[in-house]
From Swiss-Prot:
The keyword Repeat applies. Keywords: Kelch repeat, Repeat. Residues 13-59 form the F-box domain. The lineage of its organism: Eukaryota, Viridiplantae, Streptophyta, Embryophyta, Tracheophyta. It holds the Pfam family Kelch_FKB95. It comes from the Eukaryota. Gene3D superfamilies: Kelch-type beta propeller. InterPro entries: F-box-like_dom_sf, F-box/kelch-repeat_ARATH, F-box_dom, Kelch-typ_b-propeller, Kelch_1. This is F-box/kelch-repeat protein At4g23580.
Amino acid sequence: MEYGEEPPIKRTRRSFLMLPDDLVLNCLARISRLHYPTLSLVSKTFRSLLASTELYQTRILLGRTESCLYACLRLRTDSELLHWFILCHRPHSSKNVLVPISSPSFTSPSLPGVVVVGPDVYAIGGGSKNKNVSIYATGSKTYNALSSVMIMNSRSHTWHEAPSMRVGRVFPSACTLDGRIYVTGGCDNLDTMNWMEIFDTKTQTWEFLQIPSEEICKGSEYLSVSYQGTVYVKSDEKDVTYKMHKGKWREADICMNNGWSLSSSSSYCVVENVFYRYCEGEIRWYDLKNRAWTILKGLGRLPSLPTSHSNVKLADHGGKMAISWEEYMFVDREKKIWCAEIAIEKHQNGEIWGTLEWFDNVFISKTPNGYVGLVHALTATVW
């Protein structure tokens, strides 16, 4: 160094974690939760921060709510276990992928009813071959009906037990309205007393909803949905949809009834108070004014969907529609799961159009014969 020359500046490498904790949490809280699984791989410190109560509280203060899509899969290697996944961004890519999260430890050869209330996912009832509880028969299969209820907190992805139902239910149908869960059917010998149970998520208590007519409760399997501020229920026994009106049940519009059936279970959803359903490659919405099911226009870029209803799941995704479906690859003997997100626009002339925002292959099975079953797809609101 020559005389009079300034000494070189010694550069020090600074870490993001050298910032004050409050500032670090503020930065992380502004990042979408879809990136959290990738960020948790950076270090133990990041992993701890992302799971902290402080980050959760910071997101609440900033109003950082977002919708997270969860999928429940059944794999043939352990066909009675249900595996849960969350949709996340793939590292170093703009694509999305299903990432496994913790799953409840109990097994269920039948499918529990699943609903979401805020950030909590409820898995209700189901069937077991091992527990000595009430018996339920359907077709050639016999199940032990479970009354248990499990709750997953979508912030921590941990499961815990909730108060059990009063009646065991193998294939219950469930929907939510104003913070209450309405559970219908799923057991034999239903009567006006046990046809439906209601769970108050605030008080964590169950109560039966008594109905005046046994005609309504004939059957064991049902579809149910919260729509237009009330609860609609459809029975497998009678091709009739009932709706609750001022505390009483009455038959719903016949045109609406014709648009959904048990063969298309879970292939329907309500977005912004509009009822949508999937049928034979088309998504339709119920035009309440004209009492007709109308094709959702604008989806020309959406890949062809399977014609089997059970392979397609619709879900309200924060005011948009999430579509999940299966595809079997005969050459590779693999099963793929795809997801798409549809933005919905209501026009002044009463029409509703959809716009495809993205679609990705989010899961490829690695099990023998490429088997994987898409059981549920639903969205939770997370801070």
